[in-house]
Amino acid sequence: MHVQELLFVAAILVPQCLRALRYSQGTGDENCETLKSEIHLIKEEFDELGRMQRTCNADVIVNKCEGLCNSQVQPSVITPTGFLKECYCCRESFLKEKVITLTHCYDPDGTRLTSPEMGSMDIRLREPTECKCFKCGDFTR
C-alpha cells in the first residue's frame, strides 16, 4: 500500500474510530455485580490408600460475578487483522474465604452417616465479594 492510500484510509477510519470510542464510553450500560447463586457441592473423602471413606453434599448459596461490560471492535490500520479489539469481562476484584458445612454425608455403600464426627464436613472455598469489569485475559491483577 502506498503512502497516499494509507493517508486516505487513515483519514476515513480515524474519525469513525473516534465516534465508535465516544459511543462506547458514553453508553454507561456496564452492570457487573455480585449476585447470590445456589449450587450443589459434593466432596469425597479418601483414606491414605485411596479408598473412599465418605461423600458429603449440600445445596449452598455462594456469590458469583455476573453482568455486562463495554467492549468494542474498531477498524485499525495498525493491527494485522485490520481491527482493534478491546474486550472487557465481569470478574471478581476481591475474593474472601468462606467455610461451608456439608450436612448430607454417606459411606461408600450409600448409608447416611449421622455421628457428629462423620455426619458433616466443613470445606473452604473462595468466593467473590466484589466484581468489576477487567480487560479480558488480564490475569495480572
Swiss-Prot record:
It comes from the Eukaryota. Its main location: secreted. InterPro entries: Bursicon_suB (IPR034441), Cystine-knot_cytokine (IPR029034). GO terms for molecular function: G protein-coupled receptor binding; neuropeptide hormone activity; protein heterodimerization activity. One of its GO terms (cellular component) is bursicon neuropeptide hormone complex. Residues 1-20 form the signal peptide. Heterodimer with Burs; 2 cystine knot polypeptides. Final heterodimeric neurohormone released at the end of the molting cycle, involved in the sclerotization (tanning) of the insect cuticle, melanization and wing spreading. Heterodimer specifically activates the G protein-coupled receptor rk. This is Partner of bursicon.
